[in-house]
Every structure is written in C-alpha cells, then in structure tokens.
C-alpha cells in the first residue's frame, strides 16, 4: 500500500461506545483507546483530515432506567450526551499524547471542559491539521450519535463517513447468532432502507442519501482496517447512492 495515496482528504469517523469498551463490556478499554489513537495518528501523518464522533453506550445506557420509569426520555438522552463528552476527553488526551493537536467540540456548552461546536471553526481546525472530536451528539434528545455523525460529516464536508464497529461490515442478519449470515461488500442507501439493514438508524441513512455522502462500516479491531479503508482497499461494507 506504500505506493498508494489516501482516497479521502477529509473523513468523519464514528466510534461507538461499544468499540471503546473493547472486551470489558462497559467503561473504556485502555488498550483499545491506545490502538485507536495510533491508527488515527497514522492517518494524520498521511495528511488526512480527521473528524470524530464518539458514542457513549459504554458509560451509560438509559433504556433500562427509562423502561422502569426512573428517568424520562429527554433526561436519559441528556445523560447519554454527557457520556460522549467523557469518551471524547479520553480520546483527546490519547491523541495529544501522540503529539496530535486535538479539538474537543461539544453541541452542548460545557464551560472550560470543551469548546462549543461551530462548523466554520471545525473546518478551519481541520485544514490546520488538527483532529476534531465532536461530542454531545446533536445537542438534542431523540437523535442518535449515528445521526450526529452523519450531520457533522455533512457539515464539515467529509468525503466519507466511517462507522467503526465490532463487526467487519453489514450482514443480512446478526452473524453472532446466525452462522449462515451473509456479508455485503457494497449496498445502496435504498437497499439499506428497503431491507431494513441495521447499518445506522433511518434518519442517519436518509441524511447521507440526500447529501450523497458514502458510508463505510468496518471492524476497528482488525489490524490496519482503518488504514485499508482510507487507501481504498476492500474492507468492510460500503454504502453509497
């Protein structure tokens, strides 16, 4: 791959909380954080501009509390937004330990902890070579971090939205439960919507389709997978118009 150039100059990487938890199930697996920061630093070294949206499911899952009536949906979603801020802080410091200038930008104002999100500022930072981590989702309840990733990707004019998961692409059914699950190498947005494949939620998919921004789903735990995607190798599942 050394004779190849990156296929994208600017990307939006969606990291799920589940991916950050690694084998722990909950919390942050420091070895995973270290590997992710190294992979992202490698992209920066190639001149790729990197925006990141992080989830928060490794630190907080509100479904049970909401199911039992202990918190309302809005409160639960706000708690989830704060969980993404904690993950973002961890990722920022992991990248800065590798001498990567990193901006933590939040959809919710949080004083001295983050700076407020602005697409204009984010694009300026990216052009200067800084990594931008976008936290607190869209800042509104009822929207997933997948939707936030697509929204931020569109706003910063990313060439692709990359969804890093624990599975090496999109399947017709859960491969952990079905040995005969079929993996797709490529799909259209319409196929994802018609077949109700669990790539992202419908709002996120509709956003990407409307703005013609491709998606790629891949396994972040696989060695060199992120680099392979950037270099145009056959990795994971690509979703396009």
Swiss-Prot record:
UniProt main location, coarse: cytoplasm
Record-listed E.C. numbers: 2.7.4.22
MF terms (GO), sorted A to Z: ATP binding; UMP kinase activity
Localization: Cytoplasm
Entry keyword annotation includes ATP-binding: yes
GO BP terms in the entry: 'de novo' CTP biosynthetic process; UDP biosynthetic process
PANTHER family per the UniProt record, alphabetical: URIDYLATE KINASE, URIDYLATE KINASE PUMPKIN, CHLOROPLASTIC
Protein name: Uridylate kinase
Naturally occurring in which organism (per UniProt): Psychrobacter sp. (strain PRwf-1)
Organism lineage: Bacteria, Pseudomonadati, Pseudomonadota, Gammaproteobacteria, Moraxellales
